[in-house]
Amino acid sequence: MFNKLHLVSLLACGLFVIAQANTVKKCEKKMPASLKSQLCEIRKYKLLDTPDMDKHMDCVMKALDFVRPDGTGDYHKLIKPLNAIEKDRKHDFNLEKCGGQTQHLPVGKRANAYYKCLVESTSGDAFKKVFDTVELVKAKKLPALSQYSSVVDKLMKKIDDKICN
């Protein structure tokens, strides 16, 4: 009896997590009004330091699964994809540095600060490629195990053109 109850509980939790799954598109739909006019710039990695951007990037970074529920960066979710784009020890250093710099910030500011730190780091170009690839995978525009390629750039351009024009 206990095992059946335990199994039902686990299944219910799993379904709840699936129902809560987010995408960048969902985050953009509920982004604060103050950012709506800047969506194109934000999608092109313009960095903003406002409470509304903190809220938006918290949603986005959680949707992409790059940060934990408390907004702290998740080293293990990014190191392998970064090294798949460019094998370099700098990624380890930058993930550690950005994680360390942001982990003691207020919870609502962590994800945006982590994002900004990575974009501005020497891993920035590789991070943007990982970010775009994962965004497309989460939106089901690419298969789950996809890696960065020129297809990512083409799909992102198509999405950005639709949003920005």
Curated annotation (Swiss-Prot):
Key words of the record: Blood coagulation cascade inhibiting toxin, Disulfide bond, Hemostasis impairing toxin, Secreted, Signal, Toxin
Compartments, record wording: Secreted
Signal among keywords: yes
GO cellular component: extracellular region
Amino-acid positions noted as binding serotonin in the UniProt annotation, renumbered to this chain: 28, 56, 115, 132, 135
UniProt note on tissues of expression: Female salivary gland. Not detected in female carcass without salivary glands. Not detected in male tissues.
GO molecular function: odorant binding; toxin activity
KW RNA-binding (keyword) present: no
Entries under InterPro entries matching the protein: PBP/GOBP, PBP_GOBP_sf
Major localization listed first in the record, in broad terms: secreted
Positions of disulphide bridges: 27-59, 40-164, 98-117
Signal peptide: 1-21
Residues annotated to bind histamine: 115, 132, 135
Any Pfam family hit: PBP_GOBP
Task performed by this protein: Modulates blood feeding of female mosquitoes on vertebrate species by binding and sequestering different mediators involved in the host response. Binds serotonin and histamine. Increases blood clotting time.
Family according to the record: Belongs to the PBP/GOBP family.
Protein name according to UniProt: Short form salivary protein D7R1
Organism from which the protein derives: Anopheles gambiae (African malaria mosquito)
